Amino acid sequence: MQGRKAMLVLHGKQAMNEDVRSAVGDLRDSGWVLDVRVTWEAGDAQRLVAEALAAGYSHIVAGGGDGTLRDVAEAMGLAATQASLALLPLGTANDFAKAAGIPLEPASALALLNVAPQPIDLGQAGDQLFLNMATGGFGSQVTANTSEDLKKVLGAAAYLFTGLSRFSELQAASVELQGPGFHWQGDLLALGIGNGRQAGGGQVLCPEAMVNDGLLDVAILPAPQEVVGALRDLLGGDGLFVRARLPWVEIKSSQGLDINLDGEPLQAANLRFQARPAALHLHLPAGSPLLSHPG
């Protein structure tokens, strides 16, 4: 029975979600032992992961938005566990799940526990791990400044609305990026360093990223002269980006750069990003677009 025992770490706001309750019941009826623990405050997800691993759970489910998924994935990655992770995406953007082909319907998402997990990479920024993407420049500002109320009303379109309403505030960031065989220096409008492909409610910054290639995809949108067109390009994802695929990249910015790490803001003048190959075992659908050799 141990092989069919899992713990669901569920964001507190989703505790009364009837679709989630029904999906949990269906999975239990199919023979799984699925215990549920609910987060209340910062740090709970990490604590619950530690408790689950100490208790010998071989599967953990992260239920919530991109931030919750990142918290659980980071805790498991830092623990270097062989336990596997399944994602129950319940947020507004669900960027990683959408790019990976993970169902947004709770019962279908939980059913991925029956699919063999795949080893995937995690990204590392300084001493923090991330599952999906680090964004910098205006893209991170849009994500950070999109209100929860607006998300409730507009869903993922809230990010686009925020971007359009704030385009007059666009300011380029002067940065230098360096990695193996790669160097770029100048003013950028947006930056994506992706393990996954999209962030900020559907901005596909790294369209070719794979989660099992041991590399991070770097996308730089240089600052142009015409701001409104640049915002359109950022949200539309055309070919103006400078791109690279690297095992690590270092960023330097004399004035500091705002970074958004799977929904968590941070600021740094110097930061090293690197891929952590095969750092996590994740349940993904067969043929997931994020697998370089789909399982």
Curated annotation (Swiss-Prot):
Pfam families: DAGK_cat, YegS_C. It is an enzyme of class 2 (transferase). One of its GO terms (biological process) is phospholipid biosynthetic process. It is found in: Cytoplasm. One of its GO terms (molecular function) is lipid kinase activity. Residues 1-129 form the DAGKc domain. The active site is at residue 264. Mg(2+) binds at residues 210, 213, 215. One of its GO terms (cellular component) is plasma membrane. Its cofactor is Mg(2+); Ca(2+). NCBIfam families: lip_kinase_YegS, PRK13054.1, YegS/Rv2252/BmrU family lipid kinase. Belongs to the diacylglycerol/lipid kinase family. YegS lipid kinase subfamily. This is Probable lipid kinase YegS-like. It comes from Pseudomonas putida (strain ATCC 47054 / DSM 6125 / CFBP 8728 / NCIMB 11950 / KT2440).
